[in-house]
């Protein structure tokens, strides 16, 4: 999916690929780019009432809203849909230059230019975010959001017990790693970054040098080879030129 325009009113939200009130959904081997929906505008979304969703081996780039939304709600009848968002897994994906919204919206977050790379809102429980590559670019305008992971309230609830481990981040300008607000019991470990990242007390480690394969690739983990095979023919536009994704992430 690419080049989704700003056609919907602010009363309607839209993302690239999004299961809703679903169990055991598998989303893999997809590309979403240049999503410009006024509300949301993420490449991927594990939405209300989902359990055990898996998002893996996907590519996302240049999306106004960001790479991904994980959202849970609260207070629904149990025979209609599960409350919250339970055990979504986000693994072995690549996000490049996501989170570009340069305007305010009246629908939500109306006081900020809100577009974190990943947004967790409402009751998200035991989400696992692991072994993803987040390659950030300098934002083209000073007011644009510079946040990697952001938790917010929805239906009077917040995330709890979400796990972030072994993710790899390139941040060429100062970016906030996590805004937790009132979420609780989240865990961070083994995350590595090159560049400038405002980090919590533990779980993120700065690496010197350049962002390339030596930082994140493990030949004994077949998932990396599956991802690289999917990306081998993919290109993205950068400064008017089509560049190979594998070159951007330092895999070649």
Which positions does each model-derived feature cover?
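Generic detector of leucine side chains in alpha-helical contexts
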Residues: 1, 8, 26, 59, ...
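Right-handed parallel beta-helix
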Residues: 1-7, 15-18, 23-36, 42-45, ...
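Extracellular beta-strand/beta-solenoid scaffold signature
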Residues: 7-19, 38-47, 63-81, 104-121, ...
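Acidic, glycine- and Ser/Thr-rich low-complexity intrinsically disordered tracts
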Residues: 111, 127-129, 137-141, 152-252
């Amino acid at each position: 999916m690419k080049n989704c325009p700003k056609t919907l009113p602010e009363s309607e939200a839209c993302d690239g690929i999004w299961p809703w009130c679903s169990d055991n959904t598998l989303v893999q081997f997809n590309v979403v780019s240049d999503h410009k929906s006024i509300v949301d505008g993420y490449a991927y979304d594990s939405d209300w009432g989902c359990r055990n969703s898996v998002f893996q081996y996907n590519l996302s780039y240049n999306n106004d809203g960001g790479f991904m939304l994980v959202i849970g709600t609260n207070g629904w009848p149990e025979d209609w849909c599960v409350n919250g968002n339970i055990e979504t897994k986000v693994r072995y994906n690549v996000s490049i230059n996501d989170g570009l919204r340069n305007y305010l919206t009246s629908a939500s977050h109306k006081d900020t230019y809100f577009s974190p790379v990943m947004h967790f809102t409402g009751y998200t429980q035991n989400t696992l975010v692991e072994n993803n590559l987040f390659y950030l670019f300098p934002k083209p305008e000073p007011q644009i959001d510079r946040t990697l992971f952001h938790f917010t309230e929805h239906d009077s609830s917040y995330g709890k017990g979400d796990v972030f481990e072994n993710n790899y981040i390139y941040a060429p300008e100062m970016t906030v790693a996590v805004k937790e607000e009132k979420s609780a019991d989240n865990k961070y470990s083994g995350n590595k970054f090159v560049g400038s990242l405002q980090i919590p007390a533990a779980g993120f480690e700065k690496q010197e040098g350049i962002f390339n394969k030596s930082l994140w690739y493990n030949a004994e983990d077949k998932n990396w080879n599956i991802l690289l095979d999917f990306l081998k023919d993919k290109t993205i536009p950068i400064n008017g030129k089509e560049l190979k994704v594998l070159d951007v992430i330092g895999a070649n």
